Amino acid sequence: MIRSELIQKISEENPHLFQRDVERIVNTVFEEIIDAMARGDRVELRGFGAFSVKKRDARQGRNPRTGETVSVDEKHVPFFKTGKLLRERLNGLDE
């Protein structure tokens, strides 16, 4: 599912809301998650999961084409850990 499909689905399930308002809400939620992570904060959506940022240390890598050793800089990467309810639902344990 892509963002526009998510917006469409929410609009269909909430006919009292205009689609442009749903789009604004969805975009705001995503922006707030991104902003919080950029500040180094953890975003927890209870039952769904938690978004956080992990630091990957600098290291020596290898160019797969040439075999040459290359230096890979330290970087921060987004990380998502699923919540218990999401894991249970995906594994059919909530029935």
Swiss-Prot record:
One of its GO terms (cellular component) is cytosol. Transmembrane segments: none annotated. It holds the Pfam family Bac_DNA_binding. One of its GO terms (biological process) is regulation of DNA-templated transcription. Keywords: DNA recombination, DNA-binding, Transcription, Transcription regulation, Translation regulation. InterPro entries: Hist_DNA-bd, Histone-like_DNA-bd_CS, IHF-like_DNA-bd_dom_sf, IHF_beta. This protein is one of the two subunits of integration host factor, a specific DNA-binding protein that functions in genetic recombination as well as in transcriptional and translational control. This is Integration host factor subunit beta. It comes from Paracoccus denitrificans (strain Pd 1222).
